[in-house]
C-alpha cells in the first residue's frame, strides 16, 4: 500500500497509549459497559424521524416503536399523529393535506390540531436538521426538547437514513468500536488509533482519506448524550466543532432506522465560499456516509444475530 499523505493543520504529538494490536484494544467488556451506560441515560421520550427536508406538502408515514405515524404540515408547523384514522381505520398518510388538516382518503374526514377520540397530535421538534417525535408512553420521563450534543453555529449539513435488521443498541455498539474503522473501511480511513478513553467517551486520531492516499488527520471524540444517539465531534485539527450525529430509532422489535447527520464547519475563511455550494456538496457527503453505513449495518446486523442466537441457547 502506498504511503499516506497528510495535509491540513498539524496535530500535536500524543503519546502512544497502547502498543497492543487493534483486536486486543477493542475490549468487548469495555464496549459492553460503555453501551450499558449510554442506554441507561435519559432519553426524554424523543425519537429521531428523518431529515427535515423530507417533509413537504404531502403527508408521510413512518413506523416507530412498532406503531405507524403520519407527519404533515399544519398551519403552524409540522404535526404528527397516529396514521390510523379514528373513524374507520384508514391510513391517513394515503390522504391529502388541505388548509393544514389531514384529509382521510376514505370519507374525507379532516383532522388537524384538535384531538378526536383517542386520536391526537403528538409533540414534534424540528431542530433545524432533523425532525423528532416524542412518545410519552415509551417508559421514559418526557422532556420538553430532545437531549442533544452541542452543534456548531454555522455548518453545512447532510443526512442519510437507512434501515437495518437489528436493535438501536447494535448501532451504538458499532460506533463504540472505533478500532474497526481502518480495517473494515480502508476506503475512508487511512489510519486510526485511540488516544484517550474514559467511562463516558473515547477520543481517536483518525486520517480521513480525501483522494487516493491523500488525507486529513483530526482528533475526534465519541460520546452518547442519550440512549439512542452517539456523536462524533472534531476536537483537534481542521474542522474543530464539526459533528456527526448517529441516531438509532426502533422501527419494531427486529428492525431500526439509522439516521446520520453530518454538520461540517471550519474557521478557515474559505468556509464562506463553501456554504453557498451546499446543494452540490451535500450529495457527495451523503454518498460517502451511505457507503460506510452499508458496511456498518452489516456489522450491526451480525452483532444482533449473534446476540439473539446466544440468548436462545
What do these predicted ranges mean?
Residues 45-49, 67-69, 90-91, 118-123, ...:
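Short small/polar-residue motifs
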Residues 2-65:
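Zn-dependent metallo-beta-lactamase
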Residues 145-313:
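C-terminal catalytic domain of Rieske-type non-heme iron oxygenases
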Residues 17-28, 117-170:
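Short flanking/linker segments adjacent to small metal-binding domains or redox-active Cys/His motifs
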Residues 48-148:
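Rieske [2Fe-2S] iron-sulfur-binding domain
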Residues 43-46, 57, 75, 128, ...:
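Sequence-level motif detector for i,i+2 pairs with an aromatic at +2
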Residues 42-51, 106-107, 175-177, 226-231:
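Short Pro/Gly-enriched beta-strand edge/turn motifs at strand-loop
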Residues 40-42, 64, 117, 126, ...:
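A generic structural signal for short, non-catalytic loop/turn and secondary-structure boundary residues
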Amino acid at each position: 500500500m502506498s504511503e499516506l499523505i497528510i495535509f491540513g493543520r498539524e496535530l500535536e504529538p500524543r503519546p502512544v497509549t497502547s502498543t497492543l494490536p487493534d483486536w486486543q484494544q477493542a475490549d468487548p467488556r469495555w464496549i459492553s459497559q460503555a453501551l450499558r451506560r449510554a442506554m441507561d441515560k435519559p432519553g426524554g421520550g424523543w425519537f429521531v424521524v428523518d431529515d427535515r427536508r423530507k417533509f413537504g406538502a404531502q403527508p408521510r408515514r413512518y413506523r416507530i416503536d412498532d406503531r405507524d405515524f403520519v407527519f404533515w404540515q399544519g398551519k403552524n408547523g409540522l404535526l404528527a399523529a397516529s396514521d390510523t384514522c379514528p373513524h374507520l381505520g384508514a391510513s391517513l398518510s394515503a390522504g391529502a393535506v388541505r388548509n393544514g388538516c389531514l384529509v382521510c382518503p376514505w370519507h374525507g374526514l379532516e383532522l388537524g390540531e384538535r384531538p378526536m377520540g383517542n386520536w391526537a397530535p403528538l409533540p414534534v421538534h424540528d431542530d433545524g436538521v432533523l425532525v423528532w417525535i416524542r412518545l410519552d408512553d415509551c417508559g421514559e420521563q418526557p422532556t420538553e426538547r430532545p437531549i442533544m450534543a452541542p452543534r456548531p453555529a454555522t455548518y453545512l449539513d447532510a443526512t442519510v437514513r437507512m434501515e437495518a435488521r437489528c436493535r438501536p443498541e447494535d448501532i451504538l455498539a458499532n460506533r463504540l468500536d472505533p478500532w474497526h474503522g481502518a480495517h473494515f473501511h480502508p476506503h475512508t480511513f487511512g489510519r486510526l488509533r485511540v488516544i484517550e478513553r474514559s467511562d463516558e467517551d473515547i477520543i481517536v486520531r483518525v486520517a480521513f482519506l480525501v483522494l487516493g492516499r491523500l488525507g486529513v488527520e483530526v482528533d475526534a471524540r465519541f460520546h452518547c448524550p442519550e440512549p439512542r444517539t452517539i456523536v462524533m465531534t472534531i476536537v483537534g485539527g481542521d474542522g474543530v466543532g464539526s459533528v456527526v450525529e448517529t441516531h438509532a430509532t426502533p422501527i419494531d422489535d427486529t428492525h431500526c432506522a439509522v439516521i446520520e447527520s453530518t454538520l461540517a464547519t471550519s474557521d478557515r475563511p474559505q468556509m464562506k465560499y463553501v456554504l453557498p455550494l451546499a446543494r452540490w456538496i451535500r450529495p457527495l457527503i451523503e454518498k460517502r456516509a451511505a457507503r460506510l453505513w452499508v458496511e456498518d449495518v452489516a456489522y450491526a446486523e451480525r452483532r444482533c444475530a449473534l446476540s439473539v442466537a446466544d440468548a436462545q441457547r
